[in-house]
Amino acid sequence: KISEEMQIRTVWDEVQEKWYFCINDVIAALTDSKDPAEYFKKIRRRDSELDDFVRGTNCPPHQFIATDGKRHSAKCMDLQSLLRLVQAIPSKKAEPFKRWLAQVGAERIQQMQDPELGIQQSLMDYKRLGYSDNWINQRLKSIEICIYI
């Protein structure tokens, strides 16, 4: 949910075990386009790699209940595909997401260079999610044991 007036429909795919996001909703949230489907077609024409990516099985349709109460099919993307789409959108509304992607990418590369940073990030994430210090310590110990097995 982006705001009270703009929502991105999502669906959990039990088979793939991942979230899918409605492409038209994402485009509507990140652009001023009146026709998100047409905007998506234009982006695909401009970005051949994105078009090739979309032509595969990366954008399966999913059923959503519309405001009229009927079920409608909409093309969706998984998280990785969604992040690729955000990179292709030349809109000021997409810039905060692009900066966030750059920040997360830089942090991940730093964690690969210094694994201790990854452990520290895990600690902060577990605390942010509300886990107790005891639970966090047990979790980190179990991860350490799994690494040595």
Predicted features along the sequence, with ranges:
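An anion-engaging/catalytic patch
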Residues: 1-149
